[in-house]
Amino acid sequence: MRTRVIVNGANGKMGILACETLENHEQFEVVAKLSRQDNLGQSILDTKAQIVVDLTRADCVYENSLTIINHGARPVIGTSGLVETQIDELTKLCKIKQIGGIIAPNFSLGAILMMMLAAKASEYFSEVEIIEGHHQQKLDAPSGTALKTAEMMAAARKKPKNKLPLKELTPGARGGSHHDINIHSLRLPGLLARQEVLFGNIGETLSITHNSIDRRCFMPGIVLACQKVLNLTNLVYGLEHLL
């Protein structure tokens, strides 16, 4: 018997590809393709969906996640925009409900490896900044990938970065700071998703870069998340925990 999956945000570019990928996979059945005007909770009840893949927008992803969990389905969240307090609340709710879930800042294997390598490098380099770039239809900044990368590096680093007495002549020139790591966000035509983690040391720099050039690079990660979430009883933040 195939696993019943709803794709929420099915009319977007990622959603269309996700539907195509899951429909062509022997393990899954896409039982509903939802957009903004559809009733997510009622659709879960009507279809008896086991998994909801959310590929919507930052301004509704938290409410969608609550709806999915409270209606007994397992969330696979590929939408950025969740803040740490919201992730904490969703983690608690999944624990109470004994429902597995996955929040994936990035579904690309290459991007996940980039984050893991950046975390490893942070053990040796304390001076680092992140430059992320996306297409202009991405309305939130910084990206979930950049935030997750900063969190992983902050957890791995062994000494604090230097505190420089800099004065910004233009406010925001040094980017935003997350876990004491500066992040610079680009939104340009011609980009899909790109991130560079740039480390500096005396007499040298180290750059770790990932560039997504086709949304199909995210599809194996969506399949993996849908396969793994069925065996979870807790919320997992980051696909690196499932590799």
Curated annotation (Swiss-Prot):
Keyword ATP-binding: no
Residues annotated as the enzyme's active site: H134 (proton donor/acceptor), K138 (proton donor)
Reaction catalysed by this enzyme: (S)-2,3,4,5-tetrahydrodipicolinate + NAD(+) + H2O = (2S,4S)-4-hydroxy-2,3,4,5-tetrahydrodipicolinate + NADH + H(+); (S)-2,3,4,5-tetrahydrodipicolinate + NADP(+) + H2O = (2S,4S)-4-hydroxy-2,3,4,5-tetrahydrodipicolinate + NADPH + H(+)
Main location per the UniProt record: cytoplasm
GO biological process, one term: lysine biosynthetic process via diaminopimelate
GO molecular function: 4-hydroxy-tetrahydrodipicolinate reductase; NAD binding; NADP binding; oxidoreductase activity, acting on CH or CH2 groups, NAD or NADP as acceptor
Subcellular location: Cytoplasm
Residues where (S)-2,3,4,5-tetrahydrodipicolinate binds: H135, G144, T145
Entry-linked InterPro entries: DapB_C, DapB_N, DapB_N_CS, DHDPR_bac, NAD(P)-bd_dom_sf
EC number: 1.17.1.8
Gene Ontology CC terms: cytosol
Binding site for NAD(+): G9, A10, N11, G12, K13, M14, G78, T79, S80, A104, P105, N106, F107
Domain of life according to the entry: Bacteria
Pathway info: Amino-acid biosynthesis; L-lysine biosynthesis via DAP pathway; (S)-tetrahydrodipicolinate from L-aspartate: step 4/4
Described purpose of this protein according to its UniProt entry: Catalyzes the conversion of 4-hydroxy-tetrahydrodipicolinate (HTPA) to tetrahydrodipicolinate.
Family according to the record: Belongs to the DapB family.
Protein name in UniProt: 4-hydroxy-tetrahydrodipicolinate reductase
Taxonomic source organism: Legionella pneumophila (strain Lens)
Gene: dapB
